[in-house]
From Swiss-Prot:
Stored PANTHER family: BIFUNCTIONAL 3-DEHYDROQUINATE DEHYDRATASE_SHIKIMATE DEHYDROGENASE, CHLOROPLASTIC, SHIKIMATE DEHYDROGENASE
Gene name of the encoded protein: aroE
Active-site positions on this chain: K65 (proton acceptor)
Biological-process GO terms, alphabetical: amino acid biosynthetic process; aromatic amino acid family biosynthetic process; chorismate biosynthetic process; shikimate metabolic process
The protein's name in its UniProt record: Shikimate dehydrogenase (NADP(+))
Disulfide bonds, paired cysteine numbers: none
GO cellular component: cytosol
Reactions performed catalytically: shikimate + NADP(+) = 3-dehydroshikimate + NADPH + H(+)
Coiled-coil parts of chain: none
S-adenosyl-L-methionine among keywords: no
InterPro entries listed in its UniProt record: Aminoacid_DH-like_N_sf (IPR046346), NAD(P)-bd_dom_sf (IPR036291), SDH_C (IPR041121), Shikimate_DH (IPR011342), Shikimate_DH-bd_N (IPR013708), Shikimate_DH_fam (IPR022893), Shikm_DH/Glu-tRNA_Rdtase (IPR006151)
Known pathway: Metabolic intermediate biosynthesis; chorismate biosynthesis; chorismate from D-erythrose 4-phosphate and phosphoenolpyruvate: step 4/7
Similarity comment text for this entry: Belongs to the shikimate dehydrogenase family.
Length: 272
């Protein structure tokens, strides 16, 4: 059986098994890694069965990161602060350790792309599991973060978790309109449905950078929209995916694989 796997719904699109196969090729570490389509009403049971059957590590993707948090026996500091986990490790005593590597994956990719400064004004769209993992690293980097979401009380609640850490606030979608941001990050799952979050076009100018945590072959719907509004610097989340995967591999095996060669390989495969 695969002793490592990514759990999500949907999951067939995931490039995580390919990423980890490339990590294995680099490191020589045995690491059988697969995909698991977890039912929306049976994620917890599916994950427990995986570990009971000999699973050693799991990655968690949408829409289960917050639910996975509650299944862990211990949490790393960043996992606890995020309130959501994307990585789980089975400990020698059988307990489950939860971590969140999304933030380090995002910040390292934004640094690689030169899209982030310590004083960047960041609009983070969405407050689900994907967003929860990146708020703290952005604040720790020195960014001013504004949250927005279809359900505004959820954004306000998340601000309450982090107001003591850095400069963070929330605005309802209907109050967005002026280009007050250096970077707009789409942390919603709208790309999976081929749609975009309901943002006003007036947010985008040529100087506003746009980043979509989602990725696909070619531009995502969000990036296509941002380019049409005039943004000159856009990127998808493939680099974030590889970065968080490398940190997951480190948690499981104590070895940090290279990110850039894997990213270049995946980008070439997606462009073929």
């Amino acid at each position: 059986m695969d002793t490592f796997a990514v759990f999500g719904n949907p999951i067939n699109h995931s490039r995580s098994p390919r990423i980890h196969a490339l990590f294995v090729a680099e490191t020589g570490i045995t690491h059988p890694y697969g995909r698991v389509l977890a039912p929306l009403d049976g994620f917890e049971q599916t994950l427990r069965q995986f570990f009971d059957a000999g699973g050693l590590g799991a990655n968690i993707t949408l829409p289960f990161k917050e639910r996975a948090f509650s299944l862990c026996d211990q949490l790393t500091e960043r996992g606890a602060l995020a309130g959501a986990v994307n990585t789980i490790k089975k400990q020698p005593d059988g307990s489950l350790l939860g971590d969140n590597t999304d933030g380090i994956g995002l910040v390292s990719d934004l640094q690689r792309l030169d899209l982030l400064r310590q004083d960047s004004r960041v609009l983070l769209v969405g407050v689900g599991g994907a967003a929860r993992g990146v708020v703290l690293p952005l604040l720790a980097y020195g960014c001013k973060v504004v949250l927005t979401n279809r359900t505004f009380p959820r954004a306000q609640k998340l601000v309450g978790f982090y107001h003591h850490v850095g400069d963070i606030s929330a605005l309802p979608l209907e109050r967005l309109g002026t280009p007050d941001y250096d970077l707009i990050i789409n942390a919603t799952s709208t790309g999976v449905q081929g749609s975009i979050p309901p943002l006003p076009a007036s947010l985008i100018t040529s100087s506003v950078c746009c980043y979509d945590m989602y990725y696909q072959q070619g531009d995502t719907p969000f990036i296509t929209w941002c380019r049409r509004q005039g943004s000159l610097r856009c990127a998808d989340g493939l680099g974030m995916l590889v970065g968080q995967a490398a940190s997951s591999f480190l948690l499981w095996h104590g070895v940090l694989p290279s990110v850039l060669p894997v990213l270049e390989t995946l980008r070439a495969e997606l462009s073929a």
